């Protein structure tokens, strides 16, 4: 296995860097910074923290991801995928617990990158990914109903069903003006692309509805529309760094949540980088990208930030506006920093109903309802994984959905592999020319009397280890020699070795000799390391079936010297 090489895309991108490229990166960075502002505020508030912490996350994480990342155009920051898990951690462990969980997740991501496991993340079953994202979308939508309608409920339950019960019980307290602001924001965001695709609809909606709310408050005496300033104190500065108390009990309690953050971050960042590759024609480095994501999630929470990852929408905005290198991402972070320092206090006038409208659109875009509907016509096993992951995400939390979804997917995968592994009994004759890589030009070989030949087609792992024994029991024969043809066995695991060892010992007690045929180098090495050959003797390991049959005849002759 090759060792990992630390090669951020920024370094290679600066070779031959021109004034024209910088101009393109500058314009793209400014635009992406402006686009990221309302999303950072919305994601911060929806996650249960103050709006400036969402902006701080976009600044610090965006800078680190662009500085160290494995993609030239990836833009990092807070995303909707983390809202549910972050809100749950804060509710249970407080913001200190969130800091610890995020740092742990960052460490996990760094290790995934260092050990070159970036490509493995891409093997997570698609139904699980869709179940996650669709479930998160439903949860985000559900959490925004109170602000969207301006309900005056004192406290809203954390769980899905009680939350909706609370909404229905308090529907009579809805504020008409908040509803107008919320629905108006949704309408602007949905329709604005028909007017202009350069300026994001979310920014237009926030500007328009903030101005409307300000005018209504100042000149009409309206106080029913809640704004950010009514709920949060806005700071126009970066907080100092702080290292949390990471006791062992806290680490143990938060480890499952940290794994969930790491998995979600890895999936979304690599998906975003892959989508970007398809547009730019470039190729990202998955492992380098994971290290950058990990570093960002280690550093950002020390300054009060929340989990961050690569963001598809902001990355595509960067590409569409001419971003060429990671410099655009660095500029985007600088623009957000200037906005925080110079215009931070003005964000207090943004109405909560408007941010709820922004997040409703985010939830809709995340829902992947067309993909969800298409997957419902897939094999039942995939549908089961999809629905279980989706329902657990909505009704419980992402950590449970992550654990159960992956376990179910693994079990179903093992069942499928076990079903594809076939064990057959060869009778009377064998075609020696069927062995891969040889052509003997010989006629079919005759299986001697007293010899059984079994052929295994597929991996010999714990999922099918017992199937071989069941096949022999079903035959009910007691031969003198059993030849196990393993030319189509790509690998064997510990359980397979254990069962094969038990078979050899049982056969030896019954006076039956085991001979292996066609063992490939990988399986040969595994069996040798397990000292399996000491049990049956190296002479009973044959490279091809013709040699195995010859060894069987020698064994029969030795057992019956007077018989020809």
Give the predicted meaning of each segment:
Residues 334, 523-524, 543:
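Short secondary-structure capping/turn micro-motifs that flank functional sites
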Residues 28, 186, 190, 466, ...:
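Short, contiguous clusters of charged residues that form electrostatic/catalytic patches at enzyme active sites
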Residues 76, 131, 516-517, 542:
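Active-site-adjacent beta-strand anchor residues
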Residues 535-551:
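Short acidic-hydrophobic, aromatic-tinged amphipathic segments that line or gate anion-handling sites
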Residues 86, 164-167, 468-472, 548, ...:
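Generic hydrophobic alpha-helical segments
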Residues 236, 365-535, 553-564:
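The feature marks cytosolic C-terminal regulatory regions of anion transporters and related permeases
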Residues 1-432, 511, 531:
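Transmembrane helical cores of multi-pass ion-transport proteins
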């Amino acid at each position: 296995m090759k060792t990992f090489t630390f090669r951020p895309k920024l370094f290679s991108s600066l070779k031959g860097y021109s004034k024209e490229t910088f101009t393109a990166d500058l314009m793209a960075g400014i635009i992406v910074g402006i686009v990221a502002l309302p999303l950072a505020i919305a994601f911060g508030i929806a996650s249960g923290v103050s709006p400036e912490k969402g902006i701080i996350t976009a600044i610090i994480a965006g800078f680190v991801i662009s500085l160290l990342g494995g993609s030239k155009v990836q833009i990092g920051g807070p995303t909707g995928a983390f809202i549910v898990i972050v809100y749950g951690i804060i509710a249970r462990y407080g913001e200190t617990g969130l800091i610890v969980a995020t740092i742990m997740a960052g460490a996990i991501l760094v290790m995934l990158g260092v050990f070159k496991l970036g490509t493995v993340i891409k093997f997570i079953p698609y139904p699980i990914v869709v179940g996650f994202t669709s479930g998160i979308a439903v949860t985000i939508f559900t959490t925004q109903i109170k602000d969207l309608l301006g309900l005056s409920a004192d406290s809203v339950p954390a769980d899905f069903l009680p939350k909706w019960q609370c909404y229905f019980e308090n529907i009579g307290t809805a504020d008409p003006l908040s509803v107008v602001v919320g629905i108006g924001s949704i309408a602007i965001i949905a329709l604005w692309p028909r007017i202009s695709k350069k300026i994001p609809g979310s920014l237009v909606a926030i500007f328009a509805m903030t101005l409307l709310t300000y005018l209504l408050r100042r000149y009409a005496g309206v106080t029913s529309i809640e704004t950010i300033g009514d709920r949060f104190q806005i700071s126009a500065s970066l907080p100092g760094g702080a290292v949390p108390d990471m006791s062992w009990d806290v680490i143990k309690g938060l480890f499952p949540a940290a794994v969930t953050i790491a998995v979600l971050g890895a999936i979304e960042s690599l998906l975003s980088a892959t989508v970007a590759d398809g547009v730019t024609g470039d190729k990202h480095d998955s492992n380098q990208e994971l290290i950058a994501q990990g570093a960002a999630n280690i550093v950002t929470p020390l300054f009060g930030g929340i989990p961050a990852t690569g963001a598809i929408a902001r990355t595509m905005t960067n590409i569409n506006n001419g971003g060429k290198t990671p410099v655009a991402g660095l500029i985007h972070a600088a623009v957000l920093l200037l906005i925080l320092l110079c215009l931070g206090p003005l964000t207090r006038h943004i109405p909560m109903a408007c941010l709820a409208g922004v997040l409703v659109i985010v939830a809709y875009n995340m829902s992947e309802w067309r993909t969800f509907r298409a997957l419902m016509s897939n094999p039942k096993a995939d549908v089961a994984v999809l629905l279980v992951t989706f329902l657990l995400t909505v009704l419980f939390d992402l950590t449970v959905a992550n654990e159960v979804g992956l376990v179910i997917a693994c079990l179903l995968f093992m069942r499928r592999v076990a079903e594809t592994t076939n064990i057959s009994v060869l009778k009377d004759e064998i075609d020696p020319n069927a062995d891969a890589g040889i052509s003997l030009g010989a006629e079919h070989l005759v299986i001697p009397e007293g010899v059984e030949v079994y052929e295994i087609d597929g991996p010999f792992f714990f999922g099918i280890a017992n199937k071989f024994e069941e096949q022999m029991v079903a035959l009910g024969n007691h031969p003198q020699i059993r030849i196990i043809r393993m030319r189509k066995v790509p690998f064997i695991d510990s359980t397979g070795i254990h069962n094969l060892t038990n078979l050899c010992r049982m056969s030896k007690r019954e006076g039956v000799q085991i001979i292996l045929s066609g063992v490939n180098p990988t399986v040969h090495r595994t069996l040798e390391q397990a000292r399996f050959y000491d049990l049956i003797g190296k002479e009973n390991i044959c490279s091809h079936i013709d040699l195995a049959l010859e060894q069987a005849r020698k064994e029969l002759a030795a057992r019956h010297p007077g018989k020809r």
